[in-house]
């Protein structure tokens, strides 16, 4: 089963995707001059984190004041945030934008988020916390012993 972004909502969105420094900002400014009710929905997996302004190409405060932006600085770096959660908050943002007669413009470079919005999120089995906790304890133990190659050895066992 897949969590799906409503098709009627998708039809009202514009998508502008590409890597950092591809010209998305300039294209956005050009689009805003032609479609003044555009609001940007960040399609960037790093810009969602508060305090991660350096190295993420997060829009400047000036740009954010000129053009409404959504899904920036929404969680702390230590918090878990899944692609399914991204789709949900993006859907809500789009519904609010469209409700104001705005045009959602998804802009960013995280292909996983783009695919999830366009194609849905596969809902597989839940995480096995017993295994995750055991592996985390092993990694923590290796780190306490300065065993920098522990994880590499574990991967070699699994891959062979």
Protein language model regions, located:
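Phosphate/pyrophosphate-binding catalytic cores of soluble transferases and nucleic-acid-acting enzymes
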Residues: 1-160
């Amino acid at each position: 089963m897949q969590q799906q972004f409503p098709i009627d909502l998708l039809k009202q969105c514009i998508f502008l995707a590409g890597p950092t420094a591809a010209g998305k900002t300039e294209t956005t400014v050009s689009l805003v001059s032609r479609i003044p009710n555009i609001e940007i929905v960040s399609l960037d997996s790093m810009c969602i984190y508060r305090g991660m302004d350096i190295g993420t190409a997060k829009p400047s405060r000036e740009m954010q004041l000129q053009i409404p932006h959504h899904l920036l600085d929404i969680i702390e770096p230590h918090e878990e945030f899944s692609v399914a959660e991204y789709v949900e908050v993006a859907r809500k943002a789009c519904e609010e934008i469209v409700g104001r007669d705005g045009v959602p413009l998804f802009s960013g470079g995280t292909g996983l988020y783009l695919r999830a919005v366009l194609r849905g999120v596969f809902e597989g089995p839940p995480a096995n916390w017993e295994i995750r906790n055991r592996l985390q304890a092993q990694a923590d133990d290796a780190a306490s012993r300065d065993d920098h190659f522990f994880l590499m050895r574990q991967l070699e066992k699994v891959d062979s």
